[in-house]
């Protein structure tokens, strides 16, 4: 991914927190030179000094079979993004787009049945445990679980390279930066308001 120096993020902990908060990613592989992608909720864990991404495909999704021929995988994550009008700058310029994006490259392998059950248990806990009536793995009937496991294929990806870009108007002067925040706050688009919040948070960390 092309990343100008202003926008490059290298803090591993910061990136890891980002992908866990924006865990609906895009898994990209190739088959005979043709890219294939699936959008999936993903899990994350760290063992020793290595990071892993976990997830599962529907059995009927042919993409999982590409892991057998090609282990190399790209996983993409995206945060809020927003259009930035150059009318918000103090000097003439062209419009642009602010965004957060992380690309992770790695080697994929398939999960065994017990590993898949563990991955699903953790995922359900993440999204359900805070609810009034949480749907947790150990609360579901064995018959239902067995049926569901037959319909999906689990995988894990050992992360080998991480590229992260947070384009948050870091290349603008203070006046322009503050005005971009104000203008984004006035936009009706929820993404724009989230982008304004991110830019404010970044500014506070610099103070």
Curated annotation (Swiss-Prot):
Keywords assigned by UniProt, alphabetized: Sporulation
Keyword Chaperone: no
Entry annotated with the keyword rRNA-binding: no
S-S bonds: none
Pfam families (UniProt xref): FMN_bind_2
GO biological process: sporulation resulting in formation of a cellular spore
Its job: Involved in the reduction of extracellular and cell-associated protease levels, as well as in the reduced levels of alpha-amylase, levansucrase, alkaline phosphatase and sporulation inhibition, when present in high copy number.
Family recorded in the similarity comment: Belongs to the PaiB family.
Protein name: Protease synthase and sporulation protein PAI 2
Gene: paiB
